[in-house]
């Protein structure tokens, strides 16, 4: 059961990293469109908006590390839930 939990956590970590990387690339493409639109049609605080749309610092390595962090937290939650008292003892009923 432990091996299955670890395998599922690692699988979902890589799946999350792939989806996050695709989403960030899509957002970066959209951000370049918005930045070019802001240059042609200036708005108040346009530079602030353009700077907030920068996804250049987020690399696939960062998304992979974030996904691994999610997997570790999910495993920690699963292990802490599985080591708690059985349901019958926690509610005060006797377990046969």
Swiss-Prot record:
Extracellular side of membrane:
31-54
Top-level taxonomic group: Eukaryota
One GO cellular-component annotation of the UniProt record comes to:
membrane
Alphabetical UniProt keywords = Membrane, Signal, Transmembrane, Transmembrane helix
Transmembrane regions: 55-75
Q: What is its main location?
A: membrane
Topological domains, Cytoplasmic: 76-96
Protein name, UniProt field:
Uncharacterized transmembrane protein DDB_G0286141
Q: Which organism does this record belong to? A: Dictyostelium discoideum (Social amoeba)
**Lineage of the organism:** Eukaryota, Amoebozoa, Evosea, Eumycetozoa, Dictyostelia
């Amino acid at each position: 059961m432990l091996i299955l939990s670890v395998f599922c956590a690692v699988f979902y970590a890589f799946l999350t990293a792939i989806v996050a990387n695709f989403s960030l690339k899509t957002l970066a493409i959209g951000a370049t469109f918005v930045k070019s639109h802001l240059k042609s049609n200036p708005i108040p605080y346009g530079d602030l908006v353009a700077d907030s749309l920068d996804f250049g610092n987020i690399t696939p390595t960062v998304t992979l590390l974030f996904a691994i962090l999610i997997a570790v937290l999910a495993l920690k939650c699963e292990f802490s839930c599985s080591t708690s008292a059985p349901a019958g003892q926690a509610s005060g009923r006797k377990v046969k």
